[in-house]
Amino acid sequence: MDVVDLREFYASPLGNATRRLLSAKLKPRLGSLGDACVMGMGFATPYLDDLPSETKRSIAFMMARQGVIHWPREGSVQSALVDEFDLPLLESTVDLALVVHGLELTDSPIEMLQEVWRVMAPQGRLVLVVPNRRGLWDAFDTSPFGYGQPFSRTQLAGLLKEAQFSAVSWSHALQMPPTKRGFVHSGASAIERIGDLITSRFSGLIIVEAVKQVYAFSSGKRVRRLMPRFKPALLPSPVRFDGGQ
């Protein structure tokens, strides 16, 4: 699953419906950002495009195995190809991290979360979107959410705790089936509302908002990679995030 596949999906009717539904669920979690430093991870650009207009600093990191696209479409480039286990940012730089099409596609979810933790400011917020292990979307390859490793809420809670994040809210998205039939897409918003009222257990996605925790003492050991890392040419040296749109 690379950026070409992801871009083609979001250009399709099913992708448009997905973006519309997920953006509606993400909007209240992103809130007013102002001068906050916002980092997208994985393939988060369809949702970074929907950030409030007053957002001044944002960057899109795409994992080496996926490839990278120019983002945003206009203005200076704010996207980069990175090793998700070795981000080219200094510590305590990011105020909000949005991870979409990321955690389920990495070789080591815990390492990825630990690296996100490193670059986030104290009490920085992480908004994580992953395929629901119980959901229909994980069972079909009609969308990118049918690839990679799905998660249950229990699994996510364990990973977040190990990476020193504290989950503060949970929600779900994509109650409609992952079909290419147009009549389903046209009624997607109604299906979403009805599904949210009945049950979210079998929704396509889990959305969790978590906060970075900084402890004076931690009994756990942070994971270290023993294999050589891929070092992309883009942004090779750690930088302090001062980018702007």
For each feature predicted by the language model, list its residue ranges.
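Class I SAM-dependent methyltransferase SAM/SAH-binding core
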Residues: 24, 28-87
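Hydrophobic beta-strand segment of the Class I
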Residues: 97-98
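C-terminal lobe and adjacent flexible extensions of AdoMet/dcAdoMet transferase-like proteins
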Residues: 192-245
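Short, glycine-/aromatic-enriched active-site segment of Class I SAM-dependent methyltransferases
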Residues: 130-147
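A short glycine-rich, Lys/Arg-flanked "PGG" loop and its adjoining helix->strand segment in the class I
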Residues: 110-125
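Short alpha-helix
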Residues: 146-174, 206
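Conserved catalytic loop of SAM-dependent methyltransferase domains
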Residues: 168-193, 201-203
